[in-house]
Amino acid sequence: MGKPPRAMTPVEEVDLSAVRYQSPSLQAPHLTGFSLRAFVWLMESPLFGRLLTSVLKSQNNITRMLQDTVIPERPMYLPEYPPQEPEQGVLLLGDDRDPVDRVEEALHCLPPYDPSLRWPAGDKPPFLYWKIRDFAHAYRSGITTPSVVAEHIIAGVEEWSNKKPPMPMLVYFNADDLRKQAEASTKRFQQGNPISILDGIFIAIKDDIDCFPYPSKGATTFFDKIRSVEKDAVCVARLRKCGVLFIGKANMHELGLGVTGNNPNYGTARNPHSIDRYTGGSSSGPAALVSSGLCSAAIGTDGGGSVRIPSSLCGIIGLKTTYGRTDMTGALCDCGTVEVASPLAASVEDALLVYSAIAGSRPMDKLTLRPSPLCVPNLVSPDNNNILGSVKIGKYTEWFHDVSDRDISNTCEDALNLLCSSFGCQIEEIILPELEEMRTAHVVSIGTESFCDLNPHYRAGKRTEFTLDTRTSLALFGSFTSTDYVASQRIRRRIMYYHNEAFKKVDVIATPTTGITAPEIPQSSLKLGESNYVVSAYLMRFVIAGNLLGLPAITVPVGHDKQGLPIGLQLIGRPWGEASLLRVASAIEELCLQKRKRPSAFHDILNA
């Protein structure tokens, strides 16, 4: 007679005081070069593949969690949120309003622009990224034009593409098209008719989001041949309507199936703070472009930390919106349950402006998700400091400090303490059970959904055209069963319950964004790729709730480790609570502004 299955306690009956944090222990080989090629052959082998995936799942408790456990909750296939209380001190933008009008409204929520603070005379000021309003001022005052800035960008892209080692931030770049866009914007300024504050602002688009007439390859070598681009994705169309100029399609981890940014197809994007290290991924190119100064913002996708991880590693802002807050129509990954399109930016202010333009749920999501009204924080409200002072920040201390080096968590803790001492916020201890179950449920959810999307092409003979890293992931994802998927959705309901309970006592949850700073790029990974699930697990340690539960989250740079590598602090918010996150993030950014450092690979496109 077999061993009886493990039975989970109904989620409402779990005693939080009895929960003990357990640091995850992921078991998987680190592979590059020939060893990775051999491993992929074994994983795809009909004879050995099933055995190997079975061993990997057993070693990492996936089988025990999903096959040998009774989970009493019913599945949650899409995030389900209770009605939310209205946010304080916000300006309603209107989900269906013209993006130009929304951006104009959002502009009034920002502190007045003072050129003397941004363009100081005399001594060289500390390093600051140029903001969208700096470009707008420069265009309107005749300091420069979009066409001049476009030439600086073109020179920067060409310079870094020809460096040794190269810094391949873009997979598709057309200098003539960029000049054409910039010329049209320059004429609008000359005629006194700029469209919005975003007119003439250069933005990059991740290669899994449609931006006509560029192809969308997902950084593969073939996807543009089987899927044509006929028009802009909805988020891109909204930006274009505001006058945004598109640099091109940004590099990424192939099809978003990795978080380092490694890509043998087009070259691996390199971290502007240390070019021998990864940017993080999968939005590697967008993060590198913003961090290096080549654009103020970029649009990426985030299904497993893919906006927040590279933003943290590259020392910039990364906003992950609530699932369904942005319309995913026109993205390669628009059918899943964990992914969103979101901005990466040099500042919280710029993230807020870009978010104001791209936000707006699609009709189907309005019916099923019932989003709260779209709004942004009024940062010039007389009540702003009082609202900040009332914020309660949740911190699960044992989890918070489970990082590769305490430099990371201590730096994040210092930023939180500075916020509390400056505004009177309170830090509350919380407990979030079943974090390892959450990780497993996310892997199965995003993996199964990705495999479902790619399997027809995989079976149609495209298997060998994927990178070895992608093929490793797909071989594992293809081994997940319907039982695994349904069990994962039952876990999703449990994890949602725990977070909803936490949000009854706190307003935001704070963690380090990643459990490790930017890892080194192995030389052996450049041609054939790399599979390193242990490093990936460190990078993803704190980001998963944002995806499995669809919660909004933002990463803010708060300092550097002993090697000078950026450290990001993550804030996770209530459903539809982007405005509250942006308010707190703006305060933290201001408090930590002097800690930001100029990347070693940086191009000043406004003051060149």
Curated annotation (Swiss-Prot):
Disulfide bonds: none annotated. One of its GO terms (cellular component) is membrane. Substrate binds at residues 303-306. Pfam families: Amidase. Inhibited by methyl arachidonyl fluorophosphonate (MAFP). One of its GO terms (molecular function) is N-(long-chain-acyl)ethanolamine deacylase activity. InterPro entries: Amidase (IPR000120), Amidase_CS (IPR020556), Amidase_dom (IPR023631), AS_sf (IPR036928). Keywords: Cell membrane, Endoplasmic reticulum, Hydrolase, Lipid degradation, Lipid metabolism, Membrane. Its EC number is 3.5.1.-. Its main location: endoplasmic reticulum. The active site is at residues 206, 282, 306. PROSITE patterns: AMIDASES. It catalyses: N-(9Z,12Z-octadecadienoyl)-ethanolamine + H2O = ethanolamine + (9Z,12Z)-octadecadienoate; N-hexadecanoylethanolamine + H2O = ethanolamine + hexadecanoate; N-dodecanoylethanolamine + H2O = dodecanoate + ethanolamine. It comes from the Eukaryota. It is found in: Endoplasmic reticulum membrane; Cell membrane. One of its GO terms (biological process) is defense response to bacterium. Forms homodimers. Belongs to the amidase family. Catalyzes the hydrolysis of bioactive endogenous fatty acid amides to their corresponding acids. The hydrolysis of endogenous amidated lipids terminates their participation as lipid mediators in various signaling systems. Converts a wide range of N-acylethanolamines (NAEs) to their corresponding free fatty acids and ethanolamine. This is Fatty acid amide hydrolase. It comes from Oryza sativa subsp. japonica (Rice). The gene is FAAH.
